């Protein structure tokens, strides 16, 4: 029987020999893993034993094989918790140290402690939880004084750990990375993994700064400077939470960078244009951010105010284009208090009247300053002035302002005015006749010659005929009104749009009190042409009826002037009519005499300018 056993087991030995040689000659991956878990001394012993076994015969090898111990050895139990070579053991060890502590008067249920550990492993999703037996072994190694107790009633009893409790303040353990399996030592994993992330962030910041320097033409040392520059230049919104955090946390860092910016400022030659801004930094009118971004305020002002604009203005000095732009801009002076600002001398306001759209024209009229003096050519500027309130006159009634702006008192003593004060302004260059009757030139017919005008009017009505006017001598006492009618027919279109103002005396009983005359508007010297068309249809404001009769008297008033229609350009301005309205008026005889002389001179001097009006 004893011999049969070796024979029966001899195939095993024969079958085992080739794998043994294969293990020695061709190590497999299993051998490599086992060598990694065995110490060097054990490996040396195994190699010595193998050398001795190779000298054995087959029977000796079989005997050695049968004598080898079977089952797990006791050395495995001691090596598993102590060595902590497995990742699961390491996570369990860390969790117990971070969440549990010794306390003699406290008991914790075993199942609740294990459930908390299992949830922790599930949250990591990178390790498997240990079994309850292995977890209990690790707890006993960490806390050797704990005892296992069974607490609770019959059927509801639970096993508890007596002598430990949960920590009230749990510190957050360093979480491992996702690539811990590649590292040989699991403890170094959480410390090594942040390094690649930091390098990645630094590389990204460097690339962003390089891109910002090329785009913005400025130099930036960090990504923080880029963000501050974007905020100060209003390129992004400054109302976000990140913008407020950046402004609040960057004040201390800006003060440290101030000396470096002071040394870089003089190289760009910006101290001269900024000299005015350094003198009074505390009285700057604009906010510091906007002012320094535009003018590049100096480092002295930054050091005093300690605002968050240090880094933005310093890179701006490196750009030549920005420097040229700043040099062209006007210097921004500080705002002084209102009490210290000297009052600016202001000239008294000039009340210029609102002028109408009429063109300004200059004409030369022969005028006589005194009765009997030769007429002199005086240039007159025609302007249209606004309505002026009535000026108090020496007459009994208040003055009324005609549309042209002149104020003419209605008193009896001021009714007769000379030729210089009755010619209205020339409104838009309309031609007018030079033969002006006395009733229109002086404003009203003189009371002394009302009877004479009635006699001449009766005689002229009897001799009025149609056709061309006949040439008469200058000394005849009669005149034909036919030229006046033809002139009125030619200028009827223009006379229809000329404003007229008629006024008469308020309550006087003489024959001239109710006379109707046109106001001194532009074309007041149209003469009998416009007076004839306006006299019949216009009702006097004073309510007098004889206005049309005096208009007809004015048509036949001038016997010494030949019947010609001659025109002149321009008219008297209202500037010369104002003194006449205030009281500087001539007497009636002097006004009639000046009128006759003026009409004669103007007719003779302007005769060659109107060939159409010359009779054949």
UniProtKB/Swiss-Prot annotation:
Where mainly found? nucleus
Q: Positions modified as Phosphoserine?
A: 10, 185
Q: Where is the composition biased (Low complexity)?
A: 13-29
User: Which positions does the record tag as DNA-binding?
Assistant: 92-168
Q: Where does this protein have compositionally biased stretches of type Basic and acidic residues?
A: 276-293, 424-434, 606-616
Residue window of motif PxLPxI/L motif: 173-178
State where composition is biased (Gly residues): 534-546
Q: Which GO terms describe its biological process?
A: negative regulation of transcription by RNA polymerase II; positive regulation of MHC class II biosynthetic process; positive regulation of transcription by RNA polymerase II; regulation of transcription by RNA polymerase II
Does this entry carry the keyword Ligase? Answer: no
Residues modified as N-acetylalanine: 2
PTM details? Phosphorylated.
What InterPro entries has UniProt attached to this entry? DNA-bd_RFX, RFX-like, RFX5_C, WH-like_DNA-bd_sf, WH_DNA-bd_sf
Question: Which stretches of sequence are listed as region Disordered?
Answer: 1-29, 252-314, 391-616
Which disease shows up in the entry for this protein? MHC class II deficiency 3: An autosomal recessive disorder characterized by immunodeficiency and recurrent bacterial, viral, fungal and parasitic infections from birth, usually affecting the respiratory and gastrointestinal tract. Most patients die in infancy or early childhood. MHC class II deficiency 5: An autosomal recessive disorder characterized by a defect in constitutive and inducible surface expression of MHC class II molecules on B cells, monocytes, and activated T cells. Affected individuals may present in infancy with infections and hypogammaglobulinemia, but the disease course is mostly benign and patients do not develop severe infections. Some individuals may be asymptomatic.
Q: What is this protein called?
A: DNA-binding protein RFX5
* Originating species: Homo sapiens
